[in-house]
Amino acid sequence: HNQSRRQRQMCIRDSPFTDHPYIFELAATHGGVADEWHTDITFQDQPSIMSILHMVKCPEVGGDTMWTNLEQAFDELSTPMQQLCEGTTALHDAAPHSRPDIMAIHPVVRLHPETGRKSLYVNEHFTRRIVEMNVTESDAVLGYLTGWVKNPRFTVRYHWTPGTIAIWDNRCTQHFVLNDFEGERVIQRVTVMGDQVEAAAQPVAQPWVREGRKSATSRYDRQMRQYFRSRDQEAVDG
């Protein structure tokens, strides 16, 4: 579909890469430090299954990567909060890549296609809005969830050495880099593309879009209207 093609092209065009078209090389001195919790490219309709990272150069001290277990984070929510999350979806966009027009809507709780386990699927880097809530409610719930997944008991921290390779499942984890180092840090990354995200439950309400006069908070409503218009137009275009 057209939007998916644009998303793939954007990723390739806007990311530095080596001579191999599917290996992306990122250097800290050129802004390549992912120091915000995230799951890779959730702004795509079919986000990545997994990522493979090769550490080319790293500082002796600092620059560790942390991962958090989103299945455990969901399991340890209270039952009412689990039920609230399972009945909602969220809008993700590529604003950190200067492309806020590239958007996708995914369930807040997804099912792992191989294990059947449920996990939270929102992150502070790409997730903008819970679709079925107004802006104030969405900000409160997203703020809680994105803070909750950082709980130390869900996380692991790894200190790199040159030549190390890490592989992780993007369907049930988030990660981030501790930006606490000086000097250069160079990684090479391969991202394995995925399938449609499967929801743990169907949404319990229609999208909440504020109509009428514009306000400071209505930018999210305009963004959602843009998303739904684009989706409807793509359906018409076939």
What do the PLM-derived regions correspond to, one by one?
Residues H1-I12:
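Single conserved hydrophobic/aromatic residue that forms the stacking wall/gate
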Residues S15-F17:
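Short, acidic/turn-prone active-site loops that include or flank metal/cofactor-
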Residues D19-T155, H159, I165-I167, R171-G238:
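Active-site environment of non-heme Fe oxygenases that use a 2-His-1-carboxylate facial triad
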